[in-house]
Amino acid sequence: MQQDLLVYPDPKKQERYDRAYMRMAQEWSRLSHCTRKKVGALIVKDGMIISDGYNGTPTGFPNDCEDAQGLTLWYVLHAEANAIMKVARSTNNARNATLYLTHSPCKECSKLILQAGIKRLVYLNDYKDPSGLDLLEKGGILLQRLVMD
C-alpha cells in the first residue's frame, strides 16, 4: 500500500478508519430510492469527509430508479458520480482523495474517478463488470477491496 495515500501510517488505525468510512457509505446507500441496488459513496481527503453520494435520479426528477420491468432507468446517477459532482460544485476538490464505495465502479464512473484526481478506492462489493477496476488499475489508482464482518 502506498503510504503517501494513507492518512494514518499505522495500518491498524487506517483499517479502523477505512471500516468506519465504509459503514458511513453503507448508511448513505440506504438513502437511495432505488430498489434494485442501493449504492453509497464517500470521498475523504486529509482525514475529512469532503463529499458523499448515493445512486438516484437527477434533482427534480421523480425518485423512481427502475422502469416497470425492474430495469434501471438510463438517467439514474451512480453514487460516485453524485459524490464527485457534489465536490466539484464546492470550493474543494478530490485530488489525492480516497473514495469509499459500497460497490466497485462501472467503467463510465471509473473515468470520472480518474479525472477527479482520486488516488485510492476502497470498495466493498464487486460490480458485475470488472472493466472499471481494470481501468483504474491502469490509471495508477490504489484499489482495496474491504471485507466487512
Can you describe what each PLM-predicted range is?
Residues 1-149:
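Zinc-dependent deaminase catalytic domain
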